[in-house]
Structures are given as C-alpha cells and as structure tokens.
C-alpha cells in the first residue's frame, strides 16, 4: 500500500510503498515514488511493473516501478486525460486487459466518474459519470460475480456533510457510453 509521508516541517508530502514479500511476516519501505503528491494508489501491470496514480492539485501524476515497487522512476509523468481535482480516487484492475480509475470529473469535487484504460494506464477513456452531483472520495472493487462496486462520498447540496453510498453495476454499464 502507499503511505504519504511528510519528511520535513514543510507541507510537502512524499509517497512511499510499504510492501511485504512474505505474506505480511515482515514489511519493507520502497524508495521515494513522488514528492508533492498525496493519496496515491497502485496497481500491478501485466508485465509485473507497478503503476502509481498520484493526487495533485492539477492533473493526476503517475510513476512506474520496474522492480515490484522497491524503486521508482526519477521522472514523474502526468496523464493528460485525468484531471482529478485535488481529490482522492481509486485505481484497480478489473481483468487482464482493463484498469478502472475513479475520480471526480472536471476541476471540482463533483461528478465522480469511472475511467477505463485498455492499454495498462497509458490512456484513459472519457469516463462515465456515476454520481452526477457533489461527490468526492471513492473506492472500487470487483465483486465475485464480476460486477463493480463503488463506495463514494456524495451530497445533494454544497455543504460539508457527505453521505456514504454504495453502487453496483456491470462493466457493460461503463463501456456502453462515454460521458
């Protein structure tokens, strides 16, 4: 899992991966994966690389580890097709050919959408809005019947209180329309 660490008294946060190679008997900390990002998520790619999606104030950053998360590329890249307005989201593998990423669509905390990548995170589709109102943090899972579950904060008006809501839908719902 990814840990966000403030290494100095400054507000700058770095991301590290905490991992186990022995089913949790012992734990290790990776090298620094990013400086200045927050609330990162990781997914294993088909070739064994680890892809990290990193929250920033603008577009989502990403980084790749080629050694199971022990070390990370020196250069951080950004996705042109994922904005992620300084908000947490989730990144999971649906199947061998499909990654899913949940984030608010646009530049504010509303309209949480799920984006699909069919090329291991190189590009993302336009995204399907799941929550067409104020919404923010979300978590995804693939259920045993291969439907997708999403747990998300949402609210009807611009207040500080959110309700937690669970959605369930088939992958075909996401693939049917890009909006």
Protein language model regions, located:
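Asp-box/BNR beta-propeller blade signature and adjacent active/binding-site loops
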Residues: 1-179
